Regions:
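Short loop/turn segments at secondary-structure transitions that flank enzyme active sites
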Residues: 21, 33-37, 105-109, 164, ...
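Substrate-binding groove/exosite segments of carbohydrate-active enzymes
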Residues: 129-190
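Polysaccharide-binding surfaces and accessory modules of carbohydrate-active proteins
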Residues: 1-85, 89, 116-134
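Short, surface-exposed ligand- or partner-binding patches at beta-edge/loop junctions that are enriched
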Residues: 113
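Structured loops at beta-to-helix junctions and adjacent beta-edge loops in soluble globular domains
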Residues: 3, 32, 55-57, 102-106, ...
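Active-site-proximal structural scaffolding
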Residues: 8-10, 94, 147, 154
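Short Pro-Gly-centered flexible turn/kink motifs
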Residues: 10-12, 25-27, 89-109
Length: 190
């Protein structure tokens, strides 16, 4: 299992099931979220696949957040008004099966989140992980200045402050919000 969260609010979990026995093994894999419970369809790379969706309002009702979740070869399953993604998998003797689940929290104000959701849903496991790592490393190479200081503790503090500025900045420039200027709020995002 390899998990990552892309900077555009897209969470990806890649899985490889390996069967070391001499017989095929059949299992059912399920993925669910309290945020995405309505079944639907999404087109990924020209092919239709099952998707779960849901909506919720942001604090103070500033925008609507759309939860979207899909997985390779998954179908919707339900019971008592609750829905999840399910997939029957047969892992061949001595073989492996790969698949992934992708979930995103999208808004109309951040169209890149929808673009990245569809992009990662269409990539294979290895391609998805490689793409995320390359983009993550490039992001830091472009945004973290190189400052040479003799003490590692000072370097760590500098790196931390730059990380803090990049990931705890709030730019809430959406209609109806009174404070529409970027601000740094330490600790607000975790």
């Amino acid at each position: 299992v390899v998990k990552f969260i892309h900077q555009e609010n897209v969470a990806v979990t890649t899985m490889t099931l390996t069967n070391k026995s001499a017989e095929d093994q059949a299992i059912t894999v399920a993925a669910d979220s309290i945020f995405a419970t309505e079944p639907g369809k999404v087109t990924v790379n020209g092919a239709e696949q099952t998707e779960l969706t849901g909506t919720c309002s942001s604090p103070a009702g500033l925008t609507t957040i759309y939860a979207r979740m899909t997985g390779d070869g998954f179908e919707a399953a339900s019971s008592d008004d609750y829905c999840w993604l399910s997939r029957d998998v047969t892992v061949p003797a001595g073989g492996s099966v790969e698949f992934k689940v992708v979930m995103a929290f999208t808004t109309e104000e951040i169209p890149e989140s929808t673009e990245q959701y569809l992009r990662f849903a269409g990539l294979g496991n290895l391609e998805a992980v490689r793409a995320q790592k390359a983009e993550y490393n490039l992001y830091w190479a472009e945004n973290l200045p190189y400052i040479d200081v003799p003490k590692k503790a000072v370097q760590k503090a500098i790196d931390y402050r730059w990380w803090l500025e990049r990931f705890n900045s709030l730019d809430a420039n959406i209609p109806g919000y009174d404070y529409q200027y970027p601000v740094t709020i330490e600790g607000v995002l975790g």
